Design a protein with these regions (language model features):
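C-terminal output helix
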Residues: 95, 113-123, 130
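Active-site residues of response regulator receiver
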Residues: 61-62, 89
Length: 138
């Protein structure tokens, strides 16, 4: 898996309020061949950019700056853009996971995460999205 799923030039949006993590994600995704369209720290910015730019992947922290959290942002993005969303969070409590599940996310990674874990989760997210898109066309 991977080589045909993560093709060079796929566009990613990072929505993460911790600067060091956002930079690490930017670096890791770039190494995987992604073009980073933006790294923002609020749900509102993430929604605006995802709606305007229509990325191929969104990495979304759950706790963010601003009035909305990542789950709310993902829900709004999903209503407007068909894009795989991978949550990155330090929160694994039942309530958070249940809220996130309702947005039909494509991946959920607990921080801190390993490089291979990030890559495999992204590969699965892209594959799930491709299968969903194919089913919609049928």
């Amino acid at each position: 898996m991977g080589a045909d799923l993560i093709s060079p030039g796929l566009r990613a949006l990072i929505v993460e309020d911790e600067t060091l993590i956002a930079e690490e994600l930017r670096e890791r995704l770039s190494r995987l061949g992604f073009t980073i369209i933006a790294a923002v720290d609020s749900a509102e910015e993430g929604i605006a950019i995802a709606t305007r730019e229509r990325p191929d992947l969104v990495l979304m922290d759950i706790r963010l700056k601003g009035g909305k959290d990542g789950v709310e942002a993902a829900k709004e993005i999903r209503q407007q853009v068909d894009v795989p969303i991978v949550y990155l969070t330090a929160y694994s409590d039942r309530a958070t996971v249940d809220r996130a599940r309702k947005t039909e996310y494509d991946g959920y990674i607990l921080k801190p995460f390993r490089r291979d874990e990030l890559q495999s989760t992204i590969e699965v997210a892209l594959q799930r999205h491709a299968i969903r898109a194919k089913r919609k066309k049928q």
